[in-house]
Curated annotation (Swiss-Prot):
The keyword Transferase does not apply. It comes from Dictyostelium discoideum. PANTHER family: SNARE PROTEINS, VESICLE-ASSOCIATED MEMBRANE PROTEIN 9. Residues 215-250 are annotated as: Disordered. Its main location: membrane. GO terms for cellular component: contractile vacuole; endoplasmic reticulum membrane; endosome; Golgi apparatus; late endosome membrane; lysosomal membrane; pathogen-containing vacuole; phagocytic vesicle membrane. This is Vesicle-associated membrane protein 7B. The chain crosses the membrane at residues 190-210. Involved in the targeting and/or fusion of transport vesicles to their target membrane during transport of proteins from the early endosome to the lysosome. Required for heterotypic fusion of late endosomes with lysosomes and homotypic lysosomal fusion. Residues 211-260 are vesicular. It is found in: Cytoplasmic vesicle, Secretory vesicle membrane; Golgi apparatus, trans-Golgi network membrane; Late endosome membrane; Lysosome membrane. Gene3D superfamilies: 1.20.5.110, Longin domain (3.30.450.50).
Length: 260
């Protein structure tokens, strides 16, 4: 939101205020209220990348804090509208009201006006620049940083919306990294499966020409159509000798007796 914070005050007493964020700029605004003179005037205080715009009218101060690049035309138009709404609702009661006496009702008005003027940026850049020159050429601009830095003050914006966006960004990066890893593993698994299929096909082709693992995977050559078959030699049977019987001693004795 370009308009970050707004308030209505009488001197250093804040009558109503609104902001949609958290931060120490509320404390810094109290320092700035002490520096604002009571006479009617318009002025902008530049501090770091923010500008505190204020106008004083009839002892009441109308102040807002906006981004530096938001310019000054819209913030001062916003402050004029806040002033008119406040006077139409409370008249002169603001001159005697206690601190935060109008906050319960007027803070909602500040919220609506801040939302409206923060989104009123659909203007041609050149016409906006020229209108800003015409409308704020008499508005003084001062750098308030040196006076506040003496006290060691620095604006620390703790915008809840920014924190939410940061968390969403971190979650998105984490999910992207996880998705990238998952896709990488998926590709690796696909390559492994394809490699296994190729190896199986090669193995089947090789095994179709080989004896397998029975003889050390020795491949057999395919038969040639022009080769002459080698004749197988036939073995000639060897005659089995007839065994001769050896005579016994009684037979030998009988033979000798017959000779005599």
């Amino acid at each position: 939101m370009p308009i970050i914070y707004s308030l209505v005050a009488r001197g250093s007493s804040v009558l109503a205020e609104f902001t949609s964020t958290n931060g120490n700029f509320v404390t810094i605004t109290r320092r700035i209220l002490d520096l604002i003179p009571p006479n009617d005037t318009k002025m902008s205080y530049v501090y770091e990348k923010y500008i505190f715009h204020y106008l004083v009218s009839d002892t009441l101060t109308y102040l807002c804090m906006a981004d530096e690049e938001f310019g000054r035309r819209i913030p001062f138009t916003f402050l004029d509208d806040v002033k008119n709404r406040f006077k139409s609702m409370y008249g002169d009661k603001g001159k005697t009201a206690i601190a935060y006496g109008m906050n319960s009702d007027f803070s909602r008005t500040l919220e609506n006006l801040m939302d409206h003027y923060s989104n009123t940026t659909r203007v041609d850049t050149m016409s906006r620049t020229m209108a800003e020159i015409d409308e704020v050429k008499n508005i003084l601009v001062s750098d308030i940083a040196p006076q506040l830095l003496k006290r060691g003050e620095k604006i620390e914006m703790l915008v809840e919306r920014t924190d939410t966006l940061n968390q969403q960004s971190f979650k998105f990066k984490k999910q992207s990294k996880q998705l990238k890893c998952a896709m990488w593993w998926k590709n690796v698994k696909l390559m492994l499966v394809l490699g296994a299929i190729v190896l199986i096909i090669i193995f089947i082709i090789v095994m179709s020409y080989c004896d397998g693992f029975r003889s050390g995977s020795k491949c057999r050559s395919s038969p040639s159509s022009n080769s002459t078959p080698t004749p197988t030699p036939t073995e000639t049977p060897t005659p089995t000798p007839t065994p001769t019987s050896t005579p016994t001693p009684s037979q030998l004795l009988e033979t000798l007796l017959n000779q005599f």
